[in-house]
From Swiss-Prot:
Annotated InterPro entries: ITPase-like_fam (IPR029001), Maf-like (IPR003697)
Stretch forming the signal peptide: none
GO terms for MF: nucleoside triphosphate diphosphatase activity
E.C. numbers: 3.6.1.9
Domain of life assignment: Bacteria
Location of this chain's protein in the cell: Cytoplasm
Keywords carried by this UniProt record: Cytoplasm, Hydrolase, Nucleotide metabolism
Name of the protein described by the UniProt record: Nucleoside triphosphate pyrophosphatase
Cofactor: a divalent metal cation
UniProt KW Cell membrane keyword: no
Length: 199
C-alpha cells in the first residue's frame, strides 16, 4: 500500500502540480528561518545548488520528524544571478530593483526537492533552468510590478512564469516544472519506482 505523501510547504503552485499529476498528498508548512540559513551557508561559501538542497532537506526533515511512516517532500528554489542569490522581494521597490538587475541578462533557477522518511533523506534532486530576460523598459517593469505585486511578492526574482511574467523572457533552457519550483518529472519517476504511483 502506498505511503501518504506530505508536501512540507504551503506553496499553492507546488500543491497544484502534485494534484494535477494525480499524486495524493496533504500539505504541512515547515517553518524555518530561510534567510538565516542562507546567510550561514553563504558565509561557508556553499554553492547555490547546495543552498537549495539544504533548505529543501531542512523542510522535509522538520515535518518528517513529526510524522513517522510518512514520506515528506521538502522543496526550495534559489535564483543565481552572476553569483548573487536573489530572495523573495521585501517590497515593491525591491521587486523593481531585482527585475532591473535581471533584464537583458541570463540567470539560473535551481529547484531542489528532497524526500525524507522517518527523519532521514531517501531521495533528492536539484533541477536547473537557465533563463534570459528581454531588455524591457523601466516603465514596463514599473507597471508590471504595480499590476502583479500581490502575486509576485512571494516569488524569487519577482516574477511568475505561469502568469504575465512569461512576457519578460526571450529564452528558457530547462524544464517548465522546475521553473515553477518542483522538478516534477524526476519526482514522479521516483514515486513510481518505489511503487507509490502506478505506471
Amino acid at each position: 500500500m502506498p505511503q501518504p505523501l506530505i508536501l512540507a510547504s504551503t506553496s499553492e503552485i507546488r500543491a497544484k502540480m502534485l494534484s494535477n499529476a494525480g499524486v495524493p498528498h496533504t500539505t504541512s508548512g515547515a517553518r524555518i528561518d530561510e534567510e538565516m540559513v542562507k546567510e550561514a551557508l553563504l558565509a561557508e561559501q556553499a554553492s547555490p545548488r547546495d543552498i537549495a538542497d539544504t533548505l529543501a532537506e531542512m523542510k522535509a526533515r522538520k515535518i518528517s520528524d513529526k510524522t513517522p511512516g510518512a514520506i515528506v517532500l521538502g522543496c526550495d528554489q534559489v535564483l543565481d544571478h552572476r553569483g548573487v542569490l536573489l530572495s523573495k522581494p521585501v517590497d515593491s521597490h525591491d521587486a523593481l530593483t531585482q527585475l532591473q538587475a535581471l533584464r537583458n541578462d541570463r540567470h539560473t533557477l535551481l529547484s531542489a526537492a528532497v524526500i525524507c522518511e522517518d527523519g532521514k533523506p531517501v531521495w533528492r534532486h536539484v533541477g536547473v533552468v537557465r533563463l534570459r530576460m528581454h531588455d524591457v523598459s523601466d516603465a514596463y517593469l514599473q507597471d508590471y510590478v504595480a499590476r502583479n505585486w500581490d502575486s509576485i511578492r512571494h516569488a524569487v526574482g519577482a516574477y511568475k512564469l505561469e502568469e504575465e511574467g512569461v512576457r519578460l523572457f526571450s529564452r528558457i533552457d530547462g524544464d517548465y516544472f522546475t521553473v515553477l519550483g518542483l522538478p516534477l518529472l524526476e519526482l514522479l519517476s521516483y514515486l513510481a519506482l518505489r511503487g507509490d504511483l502506478p505506471r
